[in-house]
Amino acid sequence: LERSRGLGDVYKRQDYIQVDETTLPVINHDRHKAAKEYIWIVRAAVPRLLFFHYDNGSRSQKVAVDLLKTFKGYLQCDGYSAYDAFENRKDVCLCGCLAHIRRHIESCREENREYAMQGLKLIQGLYNVEYMADERQLSYEERAVLRQRLAGPLLDAFELWLQNTYPKVLKRSLMGKAIAYAYPLIPRMRHYLYDGRIFIDNNRAENALRPMVLTRKNMLFCGNRQAAENTAVICSLLGSCKECGVNPREWLNDVISRLPYYLTPKSGKNLTELLPDRWVGCRQSHDTLPTVPGMSMDNPRTVRR
């Protein structure tokens, strides 16, 4: 696990990532109870890799800045204020998440159904453009052209609706808060119109967090912060297997047998070759692995006495 923690740099070298965070209960031994801490996720869209990051359970802006200080490219996230630190960086382009905007407006249906349905209808129009592009199996370039032609005017209409509706509602109402959340994010949303690689929302990063929710239910909590760090590493590797369509059990069995060779100083091997997205090609060269003294080739985990 210790050697695996440096693999996070591989994910951050991509030029398009999605970032999110979720809670992780960790035992606080001073208070003798589980504290609500946070774990971050960085999802590289191409290649499809995940990196979970735990930094003493913090969700502060400093963690986000330290985590992504070397990243350059498109950064897709929700409206959490910690990401505002990247607003003035010329080498980072913040992209918005329409799913988060939709959830805020959808939460207003009981309070103000008329306005909520108006906003949701405009948002659905933007998603319909994505469905159309998917059905036509458009390339990234073709998708960008379609978005600019159809989604661009819809996004303009949605922005205008936000402007016109806000003065008509109470600022402290659910609708007022939803509009206050959505309107500043419109400039970030526009970036997806011009690059077909960028998704309309951050749902894929959120979906990658769902196993973490199940993990919380199964394990209840992490016993200490070291255990939380180990959890982040394990979730990074196994989550990447799922993203790449690799069987986690097969990957673990094969990689565990290879690690002794890769950790040998004279092997010349790079641990990144064992990441799930590169593992299939690496696996084909299994017969060329160097021999480790005292280790059986039939069973690399068995040391001859």
Predicted regions and their residues:
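Beta-sheet entry/capping signal
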Residues: 14-17, 39, 49, 72-74, ...
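Short helix/loop capping segments that flank catalytic or ligand/cofactor-binding pockets
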Residues: 26-28, 50-52, 61-62, 83-86, ...
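Two-metal-ion RNase H-like nuclease active-site motif
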Residues: 13-29, 77
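Electropositive, glycine- and tryptophan-enriched low-complexity nucleic-acid-binding patches
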Residues: 38-76, 104-106, 125-141
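Conserved beta-strand -> loop -> alpha-helix junction used to position metal-binding or nucleic-acid-contacting
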Residues: 16, 79, 88-121
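Short conserved beta-strand segments at catalytic cores or DNA/RNA-binding microdomains
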Residues: 33-47, 98, 241
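Single conserved hydrophobic/aromatic residue that forms the stacking wall/gate
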Residues: 1-11
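Acidic/histidine-rich catalytic cores and adjacent linkers
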Residues: 70-73, 80-82, 121-305
